[in-house]
């Protein structure tokens, strides 16, 4: 005797299948939209797909993630948070304080994250003792990227002091190329300022940007930092305003500019253009910052989701922290692994240098969260500094005025 399923039973099975597919899916909000960034993200997508987890992409263009955070706020307010969100530093802790993030303790304990993720990163990956985010990488921000052909034509070596840097920029100008490829956006201005302040001393950087000491923020050394920004401003082109960072990288890649001050995510653009470290471009620390590293760390903050979606979320977190993925992803991204036990075998010369520099800075106490990239202080303080730095860089304030404004702006934002 044939048995037929009722319409109700068929509908129930279809709903169950749909729910199962939804549970095996992760929706990911991020701002990795440049060529090099997208190539790196594809490593994670393919890794998850191999584990049977589908990926719903939610890219929001805009370096630094400001636009992405606006979209996220709207989603969370509507009660429809993504599974995971690319996030930086204090932004993660701000969401944790709101009670919006999930708990990764189960997978973190099972895989021993506490032992392999540097303590400097854990302060942003954990809240109230609980793991809330999975760190993907460590980017260091005090890098200089130099066109090797332009450097050779200048007959110069890699500059190690401020004076040597200025001499090199003058030689680039003589070649008829733009000395500094720069994008006039507040976070890019602040990235340069970050390195300039660090070049004036580790203690000074800590006092100014981590301790927020008014004496450091308002002293003669800070005036010198702003004076140096004025000098660097004279080496950018007239069309720098609003330029995206990856377009500035392209200027160096295409021999239209001599160098760029940018974090090591810039290397991904060089690699995507088939350029080779040491042959086509040079990677070095900003003069005066050798032995020190300012960092930011891309992390995926895991938001509270329905219970049926938690297993896929935990699998995503586990995949992110696996040593094999950490190596494969960071080789493409230009960053270094967010765990200390990943060998540097597959990394190029710049990657090996980045891993070595990070380890040494971590050991020597010269590893600092980057002010410009939200790892030194909360967003309100960072944005207050951005405002003063950009106004000074664009000639709206002289150095003396900028120092006075900086002290007042930071005090008001604290």
From Swiss-Prot:
Q: What is its main location?
A: periplasm
In terms of domain of life, where is this protein from?
Answer: Bacteria
Q: Which UniProt keywords apply?
A: Periplasm, Signal, Sugar transport, Transport
Give start-end of the signal peptide. 1-22
On whether Coiled coil is a keyword of this UniProt record, the answer is no
Q: Does the keyword Cytoplasm apply?
A: no
Provide a GO CC annotation, any one.
Answer: periplasmic space
What Pfam families does the annotation carry? SBP_bac_1
Localization, per the record, is:
Periplasm
Q: Could you tell me which Gene3D superfamilies the record lists for this protein? A: Periplasmic binding protein-like II
Q: Which InterPro entries does this entry report, sorted A to Z?
A: Bact_solute-bd_prot1 (IPR050490), SBP (IPR006059)
Q: List the disulfide bonds.
A: none
Q: Which residues cross the membrane?
A: none
> Which function does this protein serve?
Part of a binding-protein-dependent transport system for a sugar.
Q: Which family does it belong to?
A: Belongs to the bacterial solute-binding protein 1 family.
What is the protein name stated in its UniProt record? Probable sugar-binding periplasmic protein
């Amino acid at each position: 005797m044939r048995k037929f399923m009722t319409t109700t039973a068929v509908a129930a099975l279809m709903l169950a299948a749909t729910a199962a597919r939804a549970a095996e899916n992760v929706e990911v909000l991020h701002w990795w939209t440049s060529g090099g960034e997208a190539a790196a993200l594809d490593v994670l997508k393919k890794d998850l797909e191999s584990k049977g987890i589908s990926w719903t992409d939610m890219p929001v263009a805009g370096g630094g993630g400001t636009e992405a955070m606006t979209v996220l706020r709207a989603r969370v307010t509507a009660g429809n948070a993504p599974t995971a969100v690319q996030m930086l530093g204090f932004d993660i802790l701000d969401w944790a304080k709101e009670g919006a993030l999930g708990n990764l303790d189960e997978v973190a304990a099972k895989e021993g994250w506490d032992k392999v993720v540097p303590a400097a990163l854990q302060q942003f990956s954990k809240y109230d003792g609980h793991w809330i985010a999975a760190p993907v990488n460590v980017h260091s921000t005090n890098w200089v990227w130099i066109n090797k052909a332009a450097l050779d034509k200048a007959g110069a070596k890699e500059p190690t002091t401020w004076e040597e840097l200025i001499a090199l920029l003058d030689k680039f100008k003589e070649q008829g190329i733009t000395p500094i490829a720069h994008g006039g956006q507040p976070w890019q201005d602040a990235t340069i300022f970050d390195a300039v302040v660090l070049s004036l001393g580790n203690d000074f950087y800590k006092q100014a940007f981590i301790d927020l000491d008014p004496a450091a923020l308002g002293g003669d050394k800070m005036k010198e930092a702003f004076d140096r920004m004025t000098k660097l401003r004279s080496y950018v082109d007239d069309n720098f305003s609003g330029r995206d960072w990856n377009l500035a990288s392209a200027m160096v890649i295409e021999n239209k500019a001599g160098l760029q001050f940018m974090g090591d995510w810039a290397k991904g653009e060089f690699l995507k253009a088939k350029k080779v470290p040491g042959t086509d471009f040079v990677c070095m620390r900003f003069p005066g910052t050798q032995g020190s590293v300012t960092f930011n760390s891309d992390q995926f903050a895991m938001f509270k989701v329905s219970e049926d979606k938690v297993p896929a979320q935990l699998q995503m977190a586990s995949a992110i922290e696996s040593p094999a993925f950490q190596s494969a992803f960071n080789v493409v991204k230009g960053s270094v692994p967010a765990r200390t036990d990943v060998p540097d075998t597959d990394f190029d010369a710049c990657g090996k240098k980045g891993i070595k520099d990070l380890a040494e800075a971590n050991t020597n106490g010269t590893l600092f969260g980057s002010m410009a990239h939200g790892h030194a202080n909360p967003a309100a303080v960072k944005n207050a500094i951005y405002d003063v730095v950009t106004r000074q860089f664009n000639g709206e304030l002289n150095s003396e005025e900028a120092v006075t404004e900086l002290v007042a702006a930071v005090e008001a934002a604290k």
